[in-house]
């Protein structure tokens, strides 16, 4: 999808970083131009999501995913640099489109 606020074309993906292609997760600037700290937090979220989706996270798998989602949100909200105005609203729209197109995923 195209979003000027996210820096241009980005793959459709959900909050858990999953794409419409089963087993493919994304993180970092491919999901929108943000700080390196946000990219690292997204990488940890993608990893937690993959482990949980594969059934390898045990009883705490979903908890780890939720913690990683909160970490991404916290890191984004406290970023020293915002590269594009309206990035929060654009992410909300992206995640809504994901839900409408692909469902809740995991």
How should each PLM-predicted stretch be described?
Residues 28, 32, 102-105:
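Short beta-alpha connecting loops at secondary-structure transitions
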Residues 2-8, 45, 49-106:
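Mid-to-C-terminal Rossmann-like scaffold of FAD/NAD(P)H-dependent oxidoreductases
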Residues 1-31, 73-74:
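FAD-site-proximal beta/loop scaffold in flavoenzymes
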Residues 32-51:
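Conserved mid-domain beta->alpha element of the FAD-binding
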């Amino acid at each position: 999808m195209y979003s000027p606020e996210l820096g241009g074309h980005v793959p459709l993906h959900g909050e858990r970083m999953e794409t419409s292609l089963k087993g493919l997760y994304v993180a970092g600037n491919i999901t929108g131009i943000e700080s390196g700290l946000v990219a690292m937090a997204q990488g940890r979220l993608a990893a937690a999501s993959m482990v949980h989706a594969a059934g390898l996270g045990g009883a705490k798998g979903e908890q780890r995913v939720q913690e990683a989602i909160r970490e991404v949100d916290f890191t984004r909200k406290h970023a020293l640099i915002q590269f594009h105005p309206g990035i929060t609203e654009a992410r909300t729209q992206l995640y809504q489109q994901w839900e409408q197109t692909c469902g809740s995923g995991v």
